[in-house]
Amino acid sequence: MPSFLEPSKYCSWLSEGKLAMQAKKLEKGSSRDTITEVYRFVSTKFNYDGEKAAQLSGTRGYVPDPEETYESRKGICFDKASLMCAMLRSLGIPAKLVVGTIDGVSHAWVSAFDGDKWMKCDPTMGGWQDESEYVERYEL
C-alpha cells in the first residue's frame, strides 16, 4: 500500500503548498469523514474544463498537475481525480488514481482507503456512482 501514499508522476503535491494546506483544513476525525470532505470540496469547488477536454481529445500522454488544478479551480476528470488523490495522500490516506471508462467514455476517478475498505469517489460526476457503470483499465 505504500505506493498509494507517495507522490507520483500523476499524483504529486508540494508538502508545504496550498493544496496540502487546504487538505489539512478538511481533515476530520476519521479517514472516511476526511475522504468525504475532500470529495465534497473537489467536486463542488472545481469546474469541469470542457475547452481543455476538447483540446486533449484523442491525444495521449497528458500528465495532470494537481497544484495547477488547485490554483486554476478547473480541470478535466483526470485533473480533478489527481487533485483529490494528492490531497488524500498528503494526509496519509491511501488513494488510487483510477483510469477507465464510464458508459464507454474515457474517465478518471479515485479509490480511497477508509481503513476498512476502498471507496470509489468520482469528483467529476459529483456522486458516488453506480459501480456497474465503471470499467477500470489501470490504477496510478
Where are these regions (language model features)?
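Beta-strand-enriched, solvent-exposed domains that form extended recognition/catalytic surfaces
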Residues: M1-F4
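Secondary-structure boundary elements
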Residues: S8-G75, L83-C85, F113
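Hydrophobic/aromatic-rich core segments of domains that either
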Residues: D79-L140
